A protein has these predicted regions:
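Post-signal peptide N-terminal segment of mature Sec-exported envelope proteins
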Residues: 19-43
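Gly/Gly-Pro-rich "capping" loops immediately C-terminal to redox-active cysteine motifs
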Residues: 49-77
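The canonical Cys-X-X-Cys-His
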Residues: 40-50, 103, 107
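Extracytoplasmic/secreted proteins, especially bacterial periplasmic and envelope-associated proteins
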Residues: 35, 39, 63, 74, ...
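Sec-dependent signal peptide recognition
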Residues: 1-4
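Axial heme c-ligation environment in periplasmic c-type cytochrome domains
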Residues: 55-56, 78-115
């Protein structure tokens, strides 16, 4: 879903590259709210847990910092309307703006998981 919000800074020079361990953490992370977790798994996980997708990885804070500086209203608009590689609504047609904001917050935070 937020895969597109993601592409914009992931390719920027100077940002650290995600590692296979970062990718494994992204694959394992899930929101604690069950409904949000379902939406994340259905709409966000495929792109945001794959280095190959060029979307910012869930939990890989370095790629999210640049985006977060734009402010949540801008990020939500990018998800809702589509932006660069991010498809409109991020494949989550039943997501509200509040869902998008909660998903962005979840994906932009570090997640600890066992590898």
């Amino acid at each position: 879903m937020l895969a597109a919000v993601l592409v914009l800074a992931a390719c920027s020079k100077g940002l650290p590259e995600a590692s296979p361990a970062d990718e494994r953490r992204a694959e394992a992370a899930r929101p604690t709210d069950a409904l949000l977790a379902q939406k994340y798994e259905r709409a966000c996980l495929t792109c945001h847990a794959s280095i190959a997708s060029k979307a910012p990885l869930t939990g890989f804070v370095a790629h999210w910092q640049v985006r977060l500086q734009q402010g949540m209203p801008t990020l939500v608009a990018h998800v809702r309307d589509g932006f660069q590689g991010m498809p409109a609504r991020g494949f989550c047609n039943d997501c509200s703006d509040q869902d998008f904001a909660a998903l962005i917050v979840f994906m932009s935070q570090p997640h600890n998981s066992k590898e």
